[in-house]
Amino acid sequence: MLFNLTVLVMKTFKFHYKFILLFSNKFRFYLYYYMKTRSNSVLIPYTLNFKQVEAEMSLAEHLEEIRQRAFWSFSVLTTMIISCIIFVKNIVKTLQEPAAGIKFLQFAPGEYFFASIKVAAYSGILISSPFIVYQILLFVLPGMTKDERKTLLPIIIGSMILFLLGLIFGYYILVPASLNFFIKYGSDVVEPFWSFEQYFEFILVLLFGTALAFQLPVLQLVLGFLRIVSGKTMFSIWRYVILLSTVVGAVLTPSVDPLTQILLSSIILILYFGGASLVLVVEGSQKNNN
C-alpha cells in the first residue's frame, strides 16, 4: 500500500517516478528482507527481544547489511558535521567560556577557519557516535547468545554514559582549573594573548583524554567477565595502580601544571577502585547463580 501510494504521488506531481519506483522497490525488498530475518522493524531491533534467529543469513546478505549500515552511519556523520559547521560559532563560544577575559589572536590567515572546521568535525563525530554504535549493535547482536547480549548491552550503555560524564568533568572542572593555573601563574609578568588554534587543540585533547580515562571501569568489567583478572587481583595491585594513574594523568593532560594532573590522577584512582568493586559484585552474583 505504501509502495503504491508513493508511485501515485510521483505521478501526480509529474516527477521522474521511474527512478523513485526503482528506489522504492529496492527499499521494499530491504524492509522485507530485514523483517524476514530479524523478525522486527528497524527501530525496535529483534536482538533486544532475546530470541534466536530463525533464518541463517548468507555472506551476500551480511555484506548487504554492512553496506546499508555503513551508508546510514556515514550519512548521519556527514549531516552532523555539516550541521556543526553551520553552528560552529556557537560551539566555539561555548568552548571559549572557560577562558573568559582572554584575548585570542589569529597568527595565520586561515587559522580561525581551519581551527573551526576541526572543532566542527570533532563535534560531529561526538554527536553521531551514539547512532554509529547503535548500527554496530544491530549488526553484531543477532549473532550472539542470550547471555552475551545481556552482558554486552549494559557495558555499551555504561561506556557511553561514562564518556559523557568524562566530557562534563573535563569541561567544568579540569579545563577551568588548568586555565586558571596558567593565567594566574604569569599574570604579574605577562598579559595573556593566546593562539586561537592552540587553545582549541588544548581544550579538545583535554576533554577527549578525560572521556577516555572514564572508560577504565568498562575495561575492568570486560576483563572481569572474561575472567582474565579478578576483583581481588585488581585490589591487590593498588600500589602499581597509584603509580600508573600518575603517569596516565601526565600523559592525558596536555598541560604541565600539577593541579590538572593531580585532579585527573585522582579521578582515575576513584574510577579504578569503583570498577574493581563492581567486578567483585559481579563475581559474587555469578557464584550465587551457580
Curated annotation (Swiss-Prot):
Membrane listed as a keyword: yes
Transmembrane intervals: 71-91, 124-144, 155-175, 202-222, 234-254, 262-282
GO cellular component terms given for this protein: chloroplast membrane; TAT protein transport complex
GO biological process: intracellular protein transmembrane transport; protein transport by the Tat complex
Subcellular locations according to the entry: Plastid, Chloroplast membrane
Main location: plastid
Record GO terms (molecular function): proton motive force dependent protein transmembrane transporter activity
InterPro entries, alphabetized: Sec-indep_translocase_CS, TatC
Keyword Transcription attributed: no
Keywords: Chloroplast, Membrane, Plastid, Transmembrane, Transmembrane helix
Membrane-topology annotation of the record: Multi-pass membrane protein
Superkingdom, natural source: Eukaryota
Name recorded for this polypeptide: Uncharacterized tatC-like protein ycf43
Gene name as annotated: ycf43
